[in-house]
Amino acid sequence: MASITNHKSDPLHFVLFPFMAQGHMIPMVDIARLLAQRGLTITIVTTPHNASRFKNVLNRAIESGLPINILHVKLPYQEVGLPEGLENIDCFDSMEHMIPFFKGVNMVEESVQKLFEEMSPRPSCIISDFCLPYTSKVAKKFNIPKILFHGMCCLCLLCMHVLRKNPKILENLKSDKEHFVVPYFPDKIELTRPQVPMDTYVPGELKEFMEDLVEADKTSYGVIVNTFQELEPAYVKDYKETRSGKAWSVGPVALCNKARIDKAERGNKSDIDQDECLKWLDSKEERSVLYVCLGSICNLPLAQLKELGLGLEESTRPFIWVIRGWDKNKQLVEWFSESGFEERIKDRGLLIKGWSPQMLILSHQSVGGFLTHCGWNSTLEGITAGLPLLTWPLFADQFCNEKLVVQVLNSGVRAGVEQPMKWGEEEKIGVLVDKEGVKKAVEELMGESDEANERRRRAKELGELAHKAVEEGGSSHSNITFLLQDIMQLAQSNN
């Protein structure tokens, strides 16, 4: 596509601000590449450590001719009391870092303003993660629109909107176990108070910060969403109406990763050799393997991880189990060794201790299901790969995502988790699904019942729709065009 310009000489220049958490950064880097492929100049503003995680993927994009720049800002470690070098949430070993981290990432406004003054061509638009409310002030100072990126589906965004407009719903609940029906929804969706998305019900110190997020949300020009219209049409339509039409569904953005190496290194370099992993998968029957990954900041206690492992073992299904934070999980390492678990499952199970090449694995013909924490990136990757999902939500938006997959799309099975895994209270919460529950859920997902076969058919159909959405003429491809036309017209009127 020819370069899109905002007047006779300058191309549109979008400046992207990803939040420093893996699940937020990965899709933002994909969005950067998608926009650069349309001829835009792109600048990504982040910290040195986070930039290094995407160095290889972005360098390949730049070498291919895409106009992407990366600028660094330094976090004020000493001012907020953060350990030097702690630049990403998945590096946390304690929730004590959360408040100073949120403060720190929002104290770089002055540095960013200096960067903006030197940028050429002049920035036309900001795309900012919703966790960085300071970018609203930058947008206002330089008189450019700010587009928000939440990293959630439209069902979840609509849920947050409805609950913010109707605060009495949560206030009137008698306990954290009481269910309520989300009003004004196309489907009957029931949640408990702890299951609602994060910024609608936040106890303690984070409340003030969340209020800043809500205010920044209100003043944003629009929202870019990593979903596609055919996946959740009623929710896309209703959420778009709440934003006066300024909501663009452009996903699945992960599909911009076409080369094998880009799929393998999406987000971080893998801790397993790609060829070794693919060779193992090649040895298994088609659609027989369950892929198990509970995200980059999984906080399940040791007792629950043991039950998960034993349930996978007793299911007799081949599986890949990704265990992130392996180096910090000394007790689990000891249990694997001393209990003989690793030895017993070696012919049927593959353990990946660290980061996995998830996109490569999910798209392999031997994989037939995905046990996921329902983080939106993973959920959408599973849907895009045409896989039925076994849902195990942990916190934040993940219970809403489970409702979408199991109830609305009919392409998933619940593991049976009812309670979020609160940081700092993991041991107290303990086991939510025992080994028998794991075994039963795996069999329900991977078995040959009529319901299981119907889920597989539905999942395959959704995967095909996902790929069509990003092709030329597809809904997401067209929505990127509409977004760029909107910003171009705005830039011309400002000029």
From Swiss-Prot:
Which InterPro entries does the record associate with it? UDP_glucos_trans, UDP_glycos_trans_CS
Q: Which GO terms describe its biological process?
A: saponin metabolic process
E.C. number, please? 2.4.1.-
Q: Has the keyword Lyase been applied to this entry?
A: no
Binding sites annotated in the UniProt record for UDP-alpha-D-glucose: 23-26, 355-358, 373-381, 397-398
| Keywords on record | Glycosyltransferase, Transferase
Q: Which residues form the active site?
A: H24 (proton acceptor), D129 (charge relay)
Q: Pfam families recorded for this chain?
A: UDPGT
GO MF annotation, one: UDP-glucosyltransferase activity
The Swiss-Prot or TrEMBL record describes its family as follows: Belongs to the UDP-glycosyltransferase family.
Q: What is this protein called?
A: UDP-glycosyltransferase 73C25
**Species, as recorded:** Barbarea vulgaris (Yellow rocket)
Q: What is the lineage of its organism?
A: Eukaryota, Viridiplantae, Streptophyta, Embryophyta, Tracheophyta
The gene designation is UGT73C25
